[in-house]
Swiss-Prot record:
This is Chaperonin GroEL. Keywords: ATP-binding, Chaperone, Cytoplasm, Isomerase, Nucleotide-binding, Stress response. The gene is groEL. It catalyses: ATP + H2O + a folded polypeptide = ADP + phosphate + an unfolded polypeptide. One of its GO terms (biological process) is protein refolding. One of its GO terms (cellular component) is cytoplasm. ATP binds at D23, G24, T25, T26, T27. Forms a cylinder of 14 subunits composed of two heptameric rings stacked back-to-back. Interacts with the co-chaperonin GroES. It is an enzyme of class 5 (isomerase).
């Protein structure tokens, strides 16, 4: 039963990460999978599941606060292009995303669709 719960948890983590951030699902899935695996191993060795849960919650709070403290605002078109280029693994795509964001503004919506037409 724990394995099924773990699989559902990992699936939910990936979905929520995609919904909230649109990126990072692989990292979130790997982290969730490791948490489930090590959690099950510790429970099997006699650890208290509620104690593990509390420890994980404290760790999440610490990691979240550390990440938020080190986060930097991405404001300029150049910063957007650099960040998007790193995320996409292609600076040309980063430049296109920055250009699109420049046109629609911070509250605008950009929809990207796959095309079968080369070059478009």
């Amino acid at each position: 039963p724990y394995e099924k719960i773990g699989a559902e948890l990992v699936k939910e983590v990936a979905k929520k990460t995609d919904d909230v951030a649109g990126d990072g699902t692989t990292t979130a899935t790997v982290l969730a999978q490791a948490l489930v695996r090590e959690g099950l191993r510790n429970v099997a060795a006699g650890a208290n599941p509620l104690g593990l849960k509390r420890g994980i919650e404290k760790a999440v709070e610490k990691v979240s606060s550390t990440l938020l403290a080190s986060a930097k605002e991405v404001e300029t078109k150049e910063q957007i292009a650099a960040t998007a280029g790193i995320s996409a693994g292609d600076q040309t795509i980063g430049d296109l995303i920055a250009e699109a964001m420049d046109k629609v503004g911070n509250e605008g919506v950009i929809t990207v669709e796959e095309s079968n037409t080369f070059g478009l």
